[in-house]
């Protein structure tokens, strides 16, 4: 077995990782894999409860991509069966169960996005209903006997809900058991997940031992901070970057992140060599590299992954045009004001912005106006009751730093 190859694989696998349980067993599995020429089976379970993937979700997918590059077997489990329960990890209350149809529709969308990162030819995708739906009640009782309620209540989220008198449904206890059983069904060598999934990943090790298998290695990836640099990236918090967003949206959002996130994003979200990242770190610390230029480099790397190098270059040009030269973008979405919005010959600006989908609510529009974040024809608006009169010429509206709208009154 080439020692250099073992060292190379370990360096790649350990990049950006938060924790490996246990690391010494990983080394032994890799040695055996290299000696026998047999790839390791690397598993990631995904419950398609929310079909839109953002960069936070891609941290584990990037790690899977690295395993693919090393020649190992990558298996994605679409948890169509477990998604009907919903992962209770970190939840304060029982989650609403999805219908089978909702799960399958979400799974289809998930697959399209996953293959923007992973090589479809090297990815095995399976649904865990293939084995979980076939379990008899006797099988389920046998599975449940492998773990105790006391051990389940060691989980922080369950313990907190139990202590506060919040209900915990029995079926929620089955979620980690079923995820662990996935590892048994696949005879997984390695399972990936976020640090918040540690309990579930270790359940896989426990059950594999109970079923007479060699236990898997649990590799935990860190939870990615959102664009605010504080809270985890989340759609509900509005600090996310979706992989289906336009290059312009991606570029603007990445340029808005705190400088402290630049190197972390490069390590976790790109394939830029660590030597390059470490060199950039030194250059930023010594003032040789401006953090703004480092962000441009990061933005173009990420946009190239999900779009193209040409799209990344164009997004940079557009960003410079809007933010440095204070010009308008080449393409601005248009909105034709419907007649029913016009009242007394005028239309309220907050209503138009909401109706056009530029803001999520009329109250958000009013808040942005009162904060001076809305410009009409490059003039700042402060009146929340500002009205637009029908005009032959369109109104150009800028909301915040990155949202633009061309308002047109039909003749």
UniProtKB/Swiss-Prot annotation:
Is Coiled coil among the key words of this record? no
Single Gene Ontology BP term? tyrosyl-tRNA aminoacylation
- The broad enzyme category this protein falls into is ligase
In terms of one coarse class, where is the protein primarily found? cytoplasm
Binding sites annotated in the UniProt record for ATP: 235
A GO molecular-function annotation: tyrosine-tRNA ligase activity
Which Pfam families does this one have?
S4, tRNA-synt_1b
Positions of the S4 RNA-binding domain? 347-409
* UniProt motif 'HIGH' region: location: 48-57
Q: Which CDD domains match?
A: S4, TyrRS_core
Localization, UniProt: Cytoplasm
Motif 'KMSKS' region per UniProt: ranges: 232-236
Q: EC number(s) per UniProt?
A: 6.1.1.1
GO cellular component assignments:
cytosol
User: Span of the secretion signal?
Assistant: none
Which keywords appear in this protein's UniProt record, sorted alphabetically? Answer: Aminoacyl-tRNA synthetase, ATP-binding, Cytoplasm, Ligase, Nucleotide-binding, Protein biosynthesis, RNA-binding
The record lists the catalysed reaction(s) as: tRNA(Tyr) + L-tyrosine + ATP = L-tyrosyl-tRNA(Tyr) + AMP + diphosphate + H(+)
Keyword field contains Ligase: yes
Xref: PANTHER family: TYROSINE--TRNA LIGASE, TYROSYL-TRNA SYNTHETASE
Q: Which family does it belong to?
A: Belongs to the class-I aminoacyl-tRNA synthetase family. TyrS type 2 subfamily.
> Which HAMAP family does the record associate with it?
Tyr_tRNA_synth_type2
The protein's assembly and partners:
Homodimer.
The protein's job, in short, is:
Catalyzes the attachment of tyrosine to tRNA(Tyr) in a two-step reaction: tyrosine is first activated by ATP to form Tyr-AMP and then transferred to the acceptor end of tRNA(Tyr).
Q: What is the protein's name according to its record?
A: Tyrosine--tRNA ligase
Source organism per UniProt: Carboxydothermus hydrogenoformans (strain ATCC BAA-161 / DSM 6008 / Z-2901)
- Give the lineage: Bacteria, Bacillati, Bacillota, Clostridia, Thermoanaerobacterales
């Amino acid at each position: 077995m080439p020692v250099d190859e073992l060292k190379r694989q370990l360096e790649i696998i350990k990049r950006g990782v938060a924790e490996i349980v246990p690391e010494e067993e990983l080394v032994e599995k890799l040695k055996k894999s290299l000696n026998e020429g047999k790839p390791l089976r690397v598993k990631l379970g995904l419950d398609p409860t929310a079909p839109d993937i953002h960069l936070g979700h891609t941290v584990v997918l990037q790690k899977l991509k690295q395993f693919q590059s090393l020649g190992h077997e990558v298996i994605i489990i679409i948890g169509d069966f477990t998604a009907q329960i919903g992962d209770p990890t970190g939840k304060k209350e029982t989650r609403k169960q999805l219908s089978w149809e909702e799960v399958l529709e979400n799974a289809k969308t998930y697959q399209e996005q996953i293959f923007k990162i992973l090589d479809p030819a090297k990815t095995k995708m399976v649904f865990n209903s293939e084995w979980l739906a076939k379990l008899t009640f006797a099988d389920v009782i046998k599975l449940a006997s492998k773990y105790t309620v006391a051990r389940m209540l060691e989980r922080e989220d369950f313990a907190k809900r139990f202590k506060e008198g919040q209900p915990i449904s029995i079926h929620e206890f089955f979620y980690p058991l079923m995820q662990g059983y996935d590892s048994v069904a696949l005879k997984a060598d390695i399972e990936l997940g976020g640090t918040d999934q540690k309990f579930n990943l270790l359940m896989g090790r426990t059950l594999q031992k109970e079923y007479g298998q060699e236990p898997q290695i649990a590799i935990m990836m860190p939870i990615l901070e959102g664009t605010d640099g504080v809270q985890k990236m989340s759609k509900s918090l509005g600090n996310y970057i979706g992989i289906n967003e336009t290059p312009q949206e991606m570029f603007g959002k990445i340029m808005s992140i705190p400088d402290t996130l630049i190197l972390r994003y490069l390590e976790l979200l790109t394939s830029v060599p660590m030597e390059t990242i470490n060199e950039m770190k030194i250059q930023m610390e010594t003032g040789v590299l401006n953090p703004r230029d480092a962000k441009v480099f990061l933005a173009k790397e990420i946009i190239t992954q999900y779009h193209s190098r040409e799209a990344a270059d164009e997004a940079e040009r557009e960003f410079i045009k809007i933010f440095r030269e204070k010009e308008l973008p080449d393409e601005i979405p248009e909105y034709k004001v419907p007649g029913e919005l016009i009242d007394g010959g005028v239309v309220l600006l907050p209503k138009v912005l909401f109706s056009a989908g530029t803001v999520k609510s009329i109250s958000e529009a009013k808040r942005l106006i009162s904060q001076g974040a809305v410009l009409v024809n490059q003039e700042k608006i402060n009146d929340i009751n500002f009205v637009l009169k029908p005009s032959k010429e369109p109104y150009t509206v800028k909301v915040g730093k990155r949202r633009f709208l061309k308002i047109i009154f039909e003749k």
